A protein has these predicted regions:
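Bacterial Sec-dependent N-terminal signal peptides
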Residues: 1-29
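Extracellular and organelle-lumenal recognition/adhesion modules and their flexible linkers in secreted
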Residues: 23-315, 325-332
Length: 334
């Protein structure tokens, strides 16, 4: 009982003291800060103003890089080195024990059959070269009832084309038969009912062959597709399918005009590339090696990056240096 009374007295005293303290007059303000917005105390080095470019959320592939075709070499779906794949859970396990989401190994993001009479699959045997690990096999079984067949490239949420603009197409093609078969390539609307460009017709060969063509769009669309179609039954392989609009400053394998014009207006004094976590990766083969980003795009090393999607290395070391030169900015490679 005595303890309770003592506790109550102490509690009341603390309340009284707190109340007296809160009633004290505030300390008067004796200091004033003056800001002179017109004056300059110390100039900032202009070389400290620049930009960072990183492959994250498709900022480069599907963003700054002008390539319109997603998964152009069909190598998305190849698990990184030393990362076991769990097909049931659709995850890969990194060497550090982290589980990361991963697509089915036969996935072909950015591609689909043109019709139900067509079967497509990533092929690991009919390869363009030793550095390119997969191609796309397309098998068409046409009839009077089911019409034409083929394969569609949808790009990154559709191909944005402008009437009157030109688009540079290149691809590698191989036929399954020694007898040549005709294949028609065109830009079409999203459901393949309307042709939005001229039609490029080629004959297949029994060996890999590279083809080039310049399309001129006859309509404007934000959801166009690129089609490879045939009215006859046939099997063929595709690889390194590339479609470019006019690039900034006309650079081959270059960057998008609209984004680069916006960057140029910032007048950066330096460009830091190719990223932060992107250059770290999480196992061998999940980070860029500058020597592997040079030369023919058909031989550049594709890899699955730390942000969970495939990287073409299309904007490689040379393209970054060219970008810096065109901007008049210093390159900072990390």
């Amino acid at each position: 009982m005595k303890q309770a009374i003592i506790f109550l007295k102490l509690w009341m005293i603390s309340l009284l003291v707190g109340g007296l303290i809160s009633c004290q007059q505030e300390t008067p303000v004796t200091s004033v800060i003056h800001i002179d917005a017109e004056g300059t105390i110390q100039t900032v080095n202009p070389d400290l103003y620049g930009i960072t470019l990183e492959e994250i959320n498709h900022a480069i592939d599907g963003g700054l890089y002008a390539e319109m075709i997603q998964n152009r070499s069909f190598e998305d779906g190849i698990p990184p080195l030393n990362c076991p794949y769990d097909a049931r859970r659709r995850v890969i396990t990194t060497p550090n024990g982290y589980d990361m989401p991963f697509m089915r190994l036969d996935s072909l993001p950015g591609w689909r059959p043109l019709s139900t009479n067509t079967w497509i699959y990533p092929d690991t045997k009919e390869l363009l070269n030793e550095k390119n690990k997969r191609s796309l096999v397309v098998s068409i079984a046409t009839s009077a009832q089911n019409g034409r067949g083929g394969v569609v490239a949808e790009g990154y949420n559709g191909l944005a084309i402008q009437q009157g603009e030109t688009y540079q197409l290149s691809f590698y093609l191989k036929g399954a038969s020694v007898l040549p078969k005709n294949l028609h390539i065109a830009l079409e609307d999203s459901i393949g009912n309307r042709v939005l460009s001229d039609v490029f017709t080629v004959s297949t060969h029994y060996e890999w062959k590279k083809y080039r063509h310049t399309f001129t769009a006859n309509a404007t669309s934000n959801k166009a597709i690129l089609t490879f179609s045939s009215d006859s039954s046939q099997t063929f392989w595709l690889d390194v399918v590339s479609l470019f609009p006019e690039t900034w400053k006309g650079r081959p394998n270059g960057q998008r005009q609209d984004i680069m014009e916006a960057i140029a207006k910032l007048q950066p004094r330096f460009v830091r590339f190719p990223g932060g976590a992107f250059v770290e990766g999480y196992t061998a083969g999940t980070y860029p090696v500058w020597k592997e980003t040079l030369g023919n795009i058909a031989e550049r090393k594709h890899f699955w990056n730390v942000w969970g999607y495939g990287t073409t290395n299309g904007t490689g070391y040379h393209e970054y240096l060219q970008l810096c030169e065109d901007l008049g900015a210093e390159p900072i490679y990390v």
